[in-house]
Regions:
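C-terminal coupling/interaction segments
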Residues: 259-306
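Catalytic Walker B motif of ABC-type/P-loop ATPase nucleotide-binding domains
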Residues: 156-160
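Conserved ABC ATPase "signature" region
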Residues: 98, 102, 110-127
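Helix-to-loop junction immediately C-terminal to a conserved catalytic motif
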Residues: 49
Length: 306
């Protein structure tokens, strides 16, 4: 176990931001912390990084209280925070990388193959010798991620890591994060609002609403908590246009949904479509539907599936 968060409370100006927050983070997992804007996600990350102190409760890293570890803790963790300037605007991209390499006291230098590969993967080669004060938001995010990814830290905190990135860069980043977890056995803790990122990466999910944990458990169980009407979808080869079927057509395939597999099958037989059927599958609730469910349960019992 990497982290144990026990009964954490945090207040600002007599307002409670986090209340009785408790959960555990396991090694080599990707944990996604979900919540609306202002739910307390970034405050929680800052507490786990030791940047601010809790008013009540304890945070343990490998069984030791953060308050007792001291500066050596930061040899084990690295972070990119959305609300914090992670780089120096008056330095070039290259100079920022060299500066943070020096702080980390690693044996590698700027010309290391892995660092050069990251620069190319995130399309920063043409701007790497320019002052980062002129970078776009997406470029700054990419540079911050390169600096974070090049450390030997066991734990990586990523606060809204794909914010400001285009689709292709987001996809590349997700692949890199997954690789870090599976191949380099890093523990990754991230916050995100983007459903596709959550679907691609989450092993474990923590949902915070109004400063309290309303769900904690693995990703598949997270989706299964929603009481919903069963829905089935048939995928049919070709573009089928018929008013009764109410098809959704995409990339040469037609998609038909019904609440019963018997109803769906009967409809396909009626319209002589069984020979064109690719598959029928039961649909799971989306991330958005699941979050809406938990938000609607405010004031109820915390859900926990370990």
């Amino acid at each position: 176990m990497v982290f144990e968060v026990k009964g954490i409370e945090k207040r600002y100006n007599n307002k409670t931001i986090l209340h009785n927050i408790s959960f555990e983070i396991l090694e080599n997992n990707i944990t996604v912390i979900l919540g609306k804007n202002g739910a307390g996600k970034t405050t929680l990350i800052k507490l786990m990084l030791g940047m601010i102190s809790a008013d009540k409760g304890d945070i343990l890293f490998k069984g030791e209280n953060l308050s007792d570890i001291g500066h050596s803790y930061y040899q084990n963790v690295s972070a990119v925070l959305e609300s914090v300037d992670n780089v120096y605007p008056f330095l070039t991209g290259k100079q920022n990388i060299e500066y943070f390499l020096g702080l980390s006291k690693q044996s590698i230098n700027y010309m290391n193959d892995s660092i050069q590969a990251l620069i190319d993967e995130f399309d920063l080669r043409d701007a790497i010798d320019e002052p980062v004060g002129g970078y776009s938001r997406g470029m700054l995010q990419k540079l911050s991620l390169i600096i974070s990814l090049m450390t030997n830290a066991e734990v990586l905190f990523l606060d809204e890591p794909t914010l400001g990135l285009d689709f292709q860069s987001s996809k590349q980043l997700c692949q890199k994060i997954k690789q870090l977890s599976t191949e380099q056995e890093k523990t990754i803790i991230l916050t995100s609002h983007q459903a596709e990122i959550i679907e691609l990466l989450a092993d474990y999910v923590i949902v915070i609403d109004d400063g309290a944990v309303v769900y904690k458990g693995d990703y598949q169980n997270f989706l299964q908590q929603v009481p919903h009407t069963e829905e089935f979808e048939a995928v049919i080869e070709g573009e089928v246009i018929h008013q009764e079927l109410k098809c959704c057509i995409e990339k040469g395939k037609s998609y038909v949904k019904r609440n019963s597999i018997d109803e769906l099958t009967a409809l396909l037989v009626k319209h002589n479509l069984m020979s064109h059927l690719i598959k029928i599958e039961k649909l799971s609730p989306t991330v958005e539907e699941t979050l809406d469910y938990f938000y609607s349960q405010r004031g109820g019992v915390q859900h926990e599936v370990i």
